[in-house]
C-alpha cells in the first residue's frame, strides 16, 4: 500500500474511532484544542499519530522562521496534501518536542496559558464580540454561554450541508428538525469543551457537563467533517482572541514591573540582572 493510501485509510479509521462514544470524542477534542490553528482533517491525523502534540509546524517553518532544527531520529507527522498543481501527496509536520532551538537565534512558539489574573480581561474582551454573559457565573460557565450562543447563531447555516451528507450515517432517516437538534447540541458542546480544555479548566470537574448524546450518529467521514470543521472554525477565533488578550495583559504587567524597578533605582543592580535572567528563562518556552 502506498504511504498516501495508508494515511488516507488512517484518517477514516480515526474518524470512526472518535465518534464511538463521548469519551473518545473528548479525547480527540483535548488534542484539537491545542492545535486549533490546524483544519479539522489535519487535527484528526495529528491526533491519530501524536495525540500528545502541542505545537506543530513544517520543517521549513521550524528552520526558516523559528531557527529550530529537527532532532535526529524524529518522526514526522504525515498529513494529506491535495492540491490541483501537485495532485495527491503527503506533507509532514513536526511537534515542538521533536525540535531544538539553534544557539542564540532559535526560539520556540509562544504557547499562551490562562491564569486567574487573566480571566477578567479575557471575558470582557470576548463580550465585546459575542455579547454580555451572566457575571454571577464562573469564568468557565461564561465561556460555555458564549459557545452555546455561537452554535445557536451558526448551526442553521450548516444544516443544509449536513442534510446533503447524511446518507450512510445514523442521521439518515431523521427529519430536518431532529438533525438540526443533534447538530446544534453537539456543536455547542464541542465548542465549549474545546474552549475549556484550551484554557486549562479542570475537565474532571466540567467533563460531566458534556453528554455528547448524539456524537455516535455522525458516523461517516462526511457528516463528521461538517461537525468537525464547524467546531474548529467557530472555536478558533475565540481562542485567538483569548491568546491576544493574555499576551497583552502579560506585556502590560511586565512593563509595569520594569518601570517600578527603574523608579526604585534598581535598573543596574544585581536584582535587575536576576529579573532579566528570569525573563530570559521564561521566554525560552515561548515565541
Predicted regions and their residues:
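Single conserved hydrophobic/aromatic residue that forms the stacking wall/gate
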Residues: 277, 282-287
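N-terminal accessory/interface modules of nucleic-acid-binding and processing proteins
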Residues: 1-274, 278-279
Amino acid at each position: 500500500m502506498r504511504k498516501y493510501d495508508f494515511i488516507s485509510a488512517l484518517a477514516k479509521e480515526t474518524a470512526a474511532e472518535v465518534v464511538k462514544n463521548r469519551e473518545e470524542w473528548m479525547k480527540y477534542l483535548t488534542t484539537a484544542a491545542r492545535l486549533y490553528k490546524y483544519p479539522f482533517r489535519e487535527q484528526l491525523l495529528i491526533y491519530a499519530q501524536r495525540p500528545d502534540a502541542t505545537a506543530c509546524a513544517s520543517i521549513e517553518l521550524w528552520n526558516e522562521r523559528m531557527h529550530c532544527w529537527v532532532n535526529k531520529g524524529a518522526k514526522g507527522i504525515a498529513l494529506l496534501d491535495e492540491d490541483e498543481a501537485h495532485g495527491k501527496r503527503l506533507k509532514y509536520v513536526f511537534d515542538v518536542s521533536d525540535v531544538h532551538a539553534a544557539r542564540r537565534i532559535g526560539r520556540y512558539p509562544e504557547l499562551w496559558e490562562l491564569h486567574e489574573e487573566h480571566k477578567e480581561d479575557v471575558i470582557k474582551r470576548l463580550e465585546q464580540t459575542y455579547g454580555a454573559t451572566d457575571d454571577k457565573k464562573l469564568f468557565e460557565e461564561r465561556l460555555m454561554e458564549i459557545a452555546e450562543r455561537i452554535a445557536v447563531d451558526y448551526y442553521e447555516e450548516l444544516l443544509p450541508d449536513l442534510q446533503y451528507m447524511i446518507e450512510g450515517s445514523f442521521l439518515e432517516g431523521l427529519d430536518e428538525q431532529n438533525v438540526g437538534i443533534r447538530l446544534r447540541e453537539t456543536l455547542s458542546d464541542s465548542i465549549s469543551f474545546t474552549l475549556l480544555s484550551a484554557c486549562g479548566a479542570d475537565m474532571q470537574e466540567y467533563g460531566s457537563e458534556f453528554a455528547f448524546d448524539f456524537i455516535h450518529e455522525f458516523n461517516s467521514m462526511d457528516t463528521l467533517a461538517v461537525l468537525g470543521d464547524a467546531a474548529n472554525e467557530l472555536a478558533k477565533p475565540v481562542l485567538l482572541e483569548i491568546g491576544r488578550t493574555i499576551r497583552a495583559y502579560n506585556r502590560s504587567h511586565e512593563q509595569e514591573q520594569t518601570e517600578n524597578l527603574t523608579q526604585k533605582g534598581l535598573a543596574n543592580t544585581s536584582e535587575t540582572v536576576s529579573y532579566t535572567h528570569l525573563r530570559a528563562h521564561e521566554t525560552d518556552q515561548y515565541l
